């Protein structure tokens, strides 16, 4: 691919994929690959999902793009669906194109309403690709929670904790990524997050749940923040909600929308509230509900976790972390990681290679048989290097 500028930092291993179906990709020789990353954690219902394809084709035949002065009824229908599953009754939503944008508009609205200047997140969060987020040299407070992982009081800590005492009072928004941690799948203690939320809220700040990766069933619940005792003001949704189509949503709770009626906010983008993206969002939610995929993902996640834990030997595989169908497998030796990764691809299995770990985010439709087949191949690949 001579004329494509690749700047993701990831090596292109299979350049000749020609078709896909469900968990599987096929190259021009007909070789199949089980995609255990769901693309870039996006195809939650599998590649080439027939029902989602039907919805896309139907909407394209009606209206796929809308201008500023006209719209389509699918917007309101889809907004009601996603606000319902979030429990944001009487809230509002903005349909956008990427998770980065859903985070960005949530930050902008927070600063607009609170008139505070500093955004806050945990030190290992990934929040998007915009420079306003990647450059955290000013107007950001990063809370380093490394010591909280091993703290004896991590499950019972209170507001007197020295780590919490460092939080400034001028926080406009605390953006919480409930588990992805830049792809390394780390779960901050519940008490820590609950205390941060209380401090920020007591000082007039907003809470943003970054559910771009962890949302839409990925963690065995609709949203990752539901594993914590918090209710956010904003929810940023992306990736899996489009099943591979670039659509995202910023959800806004009712109290915040009431504030916006008194203090209006302006934001305009070419593909904001497009009917095509909205129709896909509505279809993905409907498909998940009709096929009970949240519960199935939770159950299959427990099975996958059990099998992965059985591979931990402290020689090569040192730790497994996961929730629902989102896992990290820590490998002791990066050279061995690359060798196992290449062997898995050769055998027809795609996982995420993070150097010191593998990342698994299979589609929610993965079956127990497919899980057990992958585990057997991972066990075989690992044994080659012992």
Regions found by a protein language model. Give the residues of each.
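Conserved N-terminal phosphate-binding loop of PLP-dependent enzymes in the Aspartate aminotransferase
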Residues: 1-386
């Amino acid at each position: 691919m001579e004329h494509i500028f690749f700047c993701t930092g990831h090596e292109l291993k299979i350049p000749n994929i020609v078709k896909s179906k469900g968990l599987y990709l096929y190259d021009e020789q007909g070789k199949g690959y089980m995609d255990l990353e769901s693309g870039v954690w996006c195809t939650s219902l599998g590649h080439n999902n027939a029902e989602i394809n039907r919805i896309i084709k139907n909407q394209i035949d009606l209206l796929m793009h809308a201008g500023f002065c006209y719209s389509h009824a699918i917007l309101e229908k889809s907004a009601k669906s996603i606000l319902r599953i979030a429990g944001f009754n009487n809230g509002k939503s903005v349909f956008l194109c990427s998770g980065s944008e859903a985070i960005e508009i949530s930050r902008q609205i927070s600063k607009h309403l609170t008139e505070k200047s500093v955004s806050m997140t945990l030190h290992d969060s990934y929040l998007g690709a915009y420079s306003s987020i990647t450059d955290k040299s000013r107007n950001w407070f990063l809370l380093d929670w490394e010591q909280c992982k091993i703290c004896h009081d991590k499950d019972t800590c209170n507001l007197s904790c020295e780590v919490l005492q460092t939080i400034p009072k001028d926080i406009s928004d605390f953006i919480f990524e409930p588990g992805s941690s830049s792809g390394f799948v780390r779960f901050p203690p519940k008490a820590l997050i609950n205390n941060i939320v209380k401090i920020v809220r007591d000082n007039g700040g907003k809470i943003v749940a970054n559910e771009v990766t962890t949302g839409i069933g990925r963690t065995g619940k609709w949203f990752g923040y539901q594993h914590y005792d918090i209710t956010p003001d904003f929810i940023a949704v992306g990736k899996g909600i489009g099943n591979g189509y670039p659509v995202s949503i910023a959800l806004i709770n009712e109290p915040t929308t009431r504030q916006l009626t008194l203090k209006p906010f302006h934001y305009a983008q070419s593909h904001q509230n497009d009917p095509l993206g909205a129709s896909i969002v509505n279809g993905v939610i409907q498909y998940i509900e009709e096929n009970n995929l949240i519960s199935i993902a939770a159950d299959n996640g427990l099975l996958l976790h059990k099998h992965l834990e059985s591979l931990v030997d402290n020689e090569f595989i040192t730790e497994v972390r996961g929730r629902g169908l989102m896992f990290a497998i820590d490998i002791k030796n990066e050279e061995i990681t690359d060798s196992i990764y290449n062997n898995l691809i050769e055998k027809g299995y795609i996982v995420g290679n993070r150097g010191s770990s593998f990342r698994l985010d299979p589609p929610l439709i993965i079956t127990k048989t497919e899980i057990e087949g992958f585990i057997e191949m991972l066990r075989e690949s690992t044994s080659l290097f012992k």
